Every structure is written in structure tokens, then in C-alpha cells.
């Protein structure tokens, strides 16, 4: 098992290329089950979850090749089972449920794993697919789904759900008739999936709004499609510029999709501007100013940036408040930040942060993907040496993060524990 050793206190300066979005790439890879012809997907990040997904697609009967950020997927005779050994490490694996039912009318998918940040149930996925004609049972930890032919339906989600929207969107493109999805997730990654499906011949309208309409087609065809840039990785690097008092130019940065994050970072004293196709971020206030954040579905402040902005709050002047309204148990990074000298008090879904003058390097342990990023940010700003352990979480969502940060002045090395 690896750890990152970080020597803090160095302002980061230079440029970073933002990778393709993991959260967009994963559903697009599963959607590649749907066409009967080969598809090519570009700008795919080199991440553990990506390779786990490709291994799962191979088990399901696809031929997959990954090289230099490009994936070519050739569909074969599909098999229905997504085994536990692959699914246990990654929640997104449940996204093969809709495509398998649409293509072959059956699926046997192990209940998924992934980050341990509270209950993220799949009940809305199943309820929607049942309205389209599927039936389900749970046996020995597997969701077993069957259908003759999915048919269009008018489905309203109880609450916006990214995974549920994506699963039903993929199922509906090959369903018979029209499907209307209401109260859907607005996240850009959902829009990217819809755009990929349209590139393959799907008939979809309304993506990016609360109501998506799909007219089922009999088949999808080949396409080449670039994955959108990763807004959470970009937000993390913006935060890195702020917490170290540096200046970073991010290339391939999704500025519009980061509006809620950029507004908060500006309120803390950062200057963030568009520079052509890039975004320039620098810290203008020393120290940063405290702010309040409430996580919300897009276009609100993303829960996947909550841990990172909390790291900045730890060194900001005055008090800050974080309200986590999306997931429970997503404050597990708090105790680790406190080991470094942060002053944080948690009450239910709210964390109150009082800024301190300095953080001190310490051994810390990552509990999930974004908590890992928070601890790396804290380590970059801390005095002394920080060891971030259990970084396999980090490798699930950040492409070569230590190489990118070292290229702009950080002092990070990967070691075996």
C-alpha cells in the first residue's frame, strides 16, 4: 500500500492540464454496451476506476483497448453478470444495469462498493426501471433484473439522482416508445452522457434541464467522442493555488461548470479569471477570508468539493461554516485535519471551522476520495512533513496527482508503507 509524503510550505506556480472527467467517463464507458458497433472515447483519464470498468466490460463480453487516454470498445455477445470481485470497489458499476436490460433483457449485478460516505441507495434506479417493464429480486448480494422489452414511461424521481438519471437515460434510448424523465439531475456529467448517446444515434432532448425526453430507437451506431474535463479535479487545483498562496494556470478547465466553486473561492480572496481556453488562479488575500458553504445538487456547490474547501477554511481568517446536505458521514476528514492543528467542530450535518495561523505536518489517513484530496491540500500548506496514508482512494479519482503538483513546485513523493 502506498502513501504520499509531502513537504509543505511551497507556493505552487505554473500550469496544469486538467484531465478528462472520471464521473463523466464511467457512465459513458458503460453506455458503450448499447451500440452494436465499435465506439472510440477520447480524453479518458488513467485511473483505477477506469481500468476496473474496462475489466468489467471485458467480463460482460466487450473487447476493450486503452492507450494514451483513448478507449476503443468493440461489443461482443453480452453476458449478464457483473461479479462482486469487480463491483465491490466501485459504486458506479451499478450503471451497467440499465444498458444490460436494454440490450439483452437480463442483468445480475452485485451490490456496489466504493467510498464509505454513507448510504447511497439504488432504489430510484430500480423503481424507474420497473416502470419501464423490468422486474428485480435480491439474491445473495446480487440485484437480478429481467425484462422482455423495456418500454417508454413517464418517470418522476423522488429527488434528483445522478446515477439514477444516467441509468434510466441509458435504458430509455433503446426502449420501445417515448420516455419522459422528470426531476432529473442537472450535473454536467449527465449532459455529457446524453451528448455521447446522441452522437451514437439516440434521440434525446432536454439534457441540462429538469426534464429529459427520450424517443427510443432500435439500435445505436459507432461514434468517436471526447469526455468533458474534470470539474472536481480542476476545482481541487484552484484550491491548491489558494491554500499555498501560489498562481496556477489550468488548461482545459471547465470554467462555466465551476461557477459555484469559483464564486466561493473569490469570496475567500482568490482572483480567478479566464485566460483563453484556460483559467488563471492566484491568491490575492493573505490570509484567506472565511466563508460559508452549503453543498447542493448542481448548479449549487458540489459535495465533491466540500472537503477541499474545508482545507482552505482551516487557514482562513475568522470562522467558516460547512453544511453537508447531500451525503451523511462526509466529515471523516475532519479528525485528520484536526491532527494537523485545525480547529473544527462538527454538529450533525454542519462543521464549524475557525481558522488558525498554521497547520503542522502529521501522519494522516484518507477515508475516501475527496477526503484524500483535502489532506493533500492541507499537507501542501502545512509546516513540516505530512504523510497521507491509504491513498488508493486518491488513485481512484486523480490522474497522476503527485506528478502534476510536483511540476508546479510541490514536494511530494510516493512511498510504500
UniProtKB/Swiss-Prot annotation:
GO terms for biological process: cell division; cell wall organization; peptidoglycan biosynthetic process; regulation of cell shape; UDP-N-acetylgalactosamine biosynthetic process. The keyword Cell wall biogenesis/degradation applies. GO terms for cellular component: cytoplasm. Keywords: Cell cycle, Cell division, Cell shape, Cell wall biogenesis/degradation, Cytoplasm, Peptidoglycan synthesis, Pyruvate, Transferase. The modification 2-(S-cysteinyl)pyruvic acid O-phosphothioketal is found at residue 115. It is found in: Cytoplasm. It catalyses: phosphoenolpyruvate + UDP-N-acetyl-alpha-D-glucosamine = UDP-N-acetyl-3-O-(1-carboxyvinyl)-alpha-D-glucosamine + phosphate. Phosphoenolpyruvate binds at residues 22-23. UDP-N-acetyl-alpha-D-glucosamine binds at residues 91, 120-124, 304, 326. Pathway: Cell wall biogenesis; peptidoglycan biosynthesis. InterPro entries: Enolpyruvate_Tfrase_dom, Enolpyruvate_Tfrase_sf, MurA_subfamily, RNA3'P_cycl/enolpyr_Trfase_a/b, UDP_GlcNAc_COvinyl_MurA. GO terms for molecular function: UDP-N-acetylglucosamine 1-carboxyvinyltransferase activity. The active site is at 115 (proton donor). Its EC number is 2.5.1.7. It holds the Pfam family EPSP_synthase. Belongs to the EPSP synthase family. MurA subfamily. Cell wall formation. Adds enolpyruvyl to UDP-N-acetylglucosamine. This is UDP-N-acetylglucosamine 1-carboxyvinyltransferase. It comes from Desulfovibrio desulfuricans (strain ATCC 27774 / DSM 6949 / MB). The gene is murA.
